[in-house]
Amino acid sequence: MAKHSHDHTHDHHDRPRRVRKPGEPLRIGVGGPVGSGKTALVAAICRQLRDELSLAVLTNDIYTTEDADFLRKHAVLPDSRIIAVQTGGCPHTAIRDDITANLDAIDDLIAAHDALDLILVESGGDNLTATFSSGLVDVQIFVIDVAGGDKVPRKGGPGVTFSDLLVVNKTDLAPLVGADLKVMARDAEAVRDGRPTVLQSLTEDPAATKVLDWVRSQLAAAG
């Protein structure tokens, strides 16, 4: 494996913050609890962008390659553009505390595919505390779903509060679980200090239109 670059500054937590150089792919992290719909969202983004951009996906699982296998099975990208990292422990460690394996995998993707525009980095399923290191991704999406009830945004947590985009997924299930989407939207707005929130159902909108619009805006801003 290629060794990652150590070009970075430091944020206020003294964690390495990557400095994205011109021509480097934008890295977007996709995190959230188990079963919230992270992999399905990654698949939707890939299907919509694969004909206009050069992109790749890096998944994280504890002991398996299940998420990467799902993406390959559904042919959202050529197999060589999907890499799995087996974290072998707490999934948030590999995306926040010791990101070496992820950085090396990203280097491998960049070496194998010229002029990548976007790399999606999917975390292993974890609770509401998991966030990405600023040395690993440029921006991050945090995915929750309505199955946990409308109290989830109110509970907060770093992912809900500080992610660049919060996605409340599976809104079509709200009537079945008694979740009030207006309450979820209101509570998310209250804790997110102006950061955007999207409520969506991939069943009703397989293209993930609002999330895709946000991804496009990040790509445009990144130049």
Curated annotation (Swiss-Prot):
According to the UniProt record, where is the region Disordered? Answer: 1-30
The keyword Secreted belongs to this UniProt entry's keyword annotation:
no
The entry lists its GO molecular-function terms as:
GTP binding; GTPase activity; nickel cation binding
Q: Which residues form the signal peptide?
A: none
Q: Which residues bind GTP?
A: 32-39
The answer to keyword Nucleotide-binding applying to this record is yes
- Please cite one Gene Ontology biological process associated with this protein: urea catabolic process
CDD domains tied to this protein? UreG (cd05540)
UniProt entry keywords in alphabetical sequence: Chaperone, Cytoplasm, GTP-binding, Nickel insertion, Nucleotide-binding
UniProt feature coiled coil, ranges: none
Cite the Pfam families for this sequence.
cobW
> GO CC terms for this protein?
cytoplasm
Q: How does it assemble?
A: Homodimer. UreD, UreF and UreG form a complex that acts as a GTP-hydrolysis-dependent molecular chaperone, activating the urease apoprotein by helping to assemble the nickel containing metallocenter of UreC. The UreE protein probably delivers the nickel.
What this chain does, per the entry, is described as: Facilitates the functional incorporation of the urease nickel metallocenter. This process requires GTP hydrolysis, probably effectuated by UreG.
Q: Which family does it belong to?
A: Belongs to the SIMIBI class G3E GTPase family. UreG subfamily.
- What name appears for this protein in its UniProt entry? Urease accessory protein UreG
Encoding gene per record: ureG
